[in-house]
Amino acid sequence: MMERSSRFTAINGWGVAAVGVMAIAAAWVAASLFGQEGAGWLSTLYGNTSMLMAYKTRVAVVGSLLLVAVCGSTVFFSSMAQARRRGLTFAFDATMRRLVLNFSVPLLAGGILCLALVLQGHYGLTSSIMLIFYGLALINCHHFSQPVLGVLGYAELALGLADCFVATHALLFWGVGFGLLHILLGLYLIVKDRRS
């Protein structure tokens, strides 16, 4: 789990890949609920556009919080199991505290910004902001974990910046960033773990 007591290395590839699958599923659900096709049946159900927007906002906020909790738990518990399989202790020591702090600050700032935008009805750049701040969080914490997290962080950052310039397809960018890139990272970690 620890590499010279300065790096947390017990990140489970299966857990990371599972997070990617959950993100793709969430993007699909969001597209079916809020996309062009989904808007029809929601409009029939709610009729009034202000009621529809209030419903969309509630579903988006609750769904996002639930997804973050499930994905975070998946990575946490799968990494704890991996550390135990390697015969290492999974402790909240100084390295883990630095990792969590460096990851949490940009992630929390981006999350609060996204929540404020959604609650004010400004949905346009929400997916971009999520990708950008998540990328910054990974870049900020990769010094205390596996260096490949920095690569993922730069990829998320670039994808988020590209998403800023595309008025449509926000869920596609979101699905690629949080879904496909996590699946690829998970597969990389699985192969790397099997070779060592």
State what each model feature region is.
Residues 20-30, 68-72, 107, 111, ...:
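Helical transmembrane-bundle signal
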Residues 6-13, 58, 97, 121-128, ...:
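Membrane-water interface of alpha-helical transmembrane segments
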Residues 88-149:
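Membrane-proximal helix-loop-helix units in multi-pass membrane proteins
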Residues 31, 35-39, 80-88, 118-122, ...:
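Transmembrane helix-loop junctions in multipass membrane proteins, especially transporters and channels
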Residues 1-4, 10-32, 169-196:
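Membrane-interface module
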Residues 12-23, 63-68, 103, 127-130, ...:
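Hydrophobic alpha-helical transmembrane segments of polytopic
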Residues 6-107:
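Selected alpha-helical membrane-embedding segments in polytopic membrane proteins
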Residues 134-196:
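Terminal transmembrane helical module of multi-pass membrane proteins
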